[in-house]
């Protein structure tokens, strides 16, 4: 995992867009983003321990690629890259490929880009604005973990999401707008 401020230069979203301003794991923790490095070799017991500790009861695999998503590939990528939030945590353990999660830093509203690769386990909290894109390899395979039934419901950023209880709770948790 490598994190840095997004450069906001127009162009292919799959490029690194590295501003040269690194972001520390401590900064990510202050945004309630959790990260673990779990090597692929023998990952299951460690992943299961994190899942049990955090109350994740369900999981599935997602293959974000033309082969994995078929005819819905372009539409899914567009949806993933639209700025949105969820009412549940978004948990991903990368087993193959790579990509970028962009998260909004509050209160600055700057994008932080987080590059993920095999062995990275990332937890994006409920209520944070974020988006996802593949990198130039156009492929990622990840295990998605869920506290309840598997679901992925995005709420695109709007006036309504600003007053969503999960958004308000997130901002309180990180000490913004309390």
UniProtKB/Swiss-Prot annotation:
Query: InterPro entries from the entry?
Result: ARD (IPR004313), ARD_euk (IPR027496), RmlC-like_jellyroll (IPR014710), RmlC_Cupin_sf (IPR011051)
Stated EC number for the protein is: 1.13.11.54, 1.13.11.53
Give the required cofactors.
Fe(2+); Ni(2+)
Alphabetical GO CC annotations of the entry are: cytoplasm; nucleus
The record describes the protein's role as: Catalyzes 2 different reactions between oxygen and the acireductone 1,2-dihydroxy-3-keto-5-methylthiopentene (DHK-MTPene) depending upon the metal bound in the active site. Fe-containing acireductone dioxygenase (Fe-ARD) produces formate and 2-keto-4-methylthiobutyrate (KMTB), the alpha-ketoacid precursor of methionine in the methionine recycle pathway. Ni-containing acireductone dioxygenase (Ni-ARD) produces methylthiopropionate, carbon monoxide and formate, and does not lie on the methionine recycle pathway.
Listed HAMAP family: Salvage_MtnD_euk
The similarity annotation says: Belongs to the acireductone dioxygenase (ARD) family.
For this entry, the protein name equals Acireductone dioxygenase 1
> From which organism does this entry originate?
Coprinopsis cinerea (strain Okayama-7 / 130 / ATCC MYA-4618 / FGSC 9003)
| Lineage, highest ranks first | Eukaryota, Fungi, Dikarya, Basidiomycota, Agaricomycotina
């Amino acid at each position: 995992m490598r994190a840095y401020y997004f450069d906001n230069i127009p162009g292919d979203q799959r490029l690194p867009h590295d501003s040269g301003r690194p972001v520390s794991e401590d900064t990510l923790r202050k945004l309630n983003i959790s990260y673990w490095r779990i090597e692929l070799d023998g990952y299951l017991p460690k992943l299961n321990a994190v899942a049990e500790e955090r109350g994740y009861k369900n999981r599935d695999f997602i293959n974000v690629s033309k082969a994995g998503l078929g005819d819905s590939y372009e539409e899914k990528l567009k949806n993933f890259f639209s700025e949105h939030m969820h009412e549940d945590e978004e948990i991903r353990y990368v087993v193959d490929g790579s990509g970028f999660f962009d998260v909004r830093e509050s209160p600055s509203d700057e994008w932080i880009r987080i590059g993920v690769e095999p062995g990275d386990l990332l937890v994006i909290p409920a209520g944070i604005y974020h988006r996802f894109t593949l990198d130039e390899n156009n492929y990622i395979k990840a295990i998605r973990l869920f506290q309840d039934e598997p679901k992925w419901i995005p709420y695109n950023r709007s006036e309504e999401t600003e007053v969503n209880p999960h958004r308000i709770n997130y901002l309180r948790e990180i000490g913004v707008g309390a």
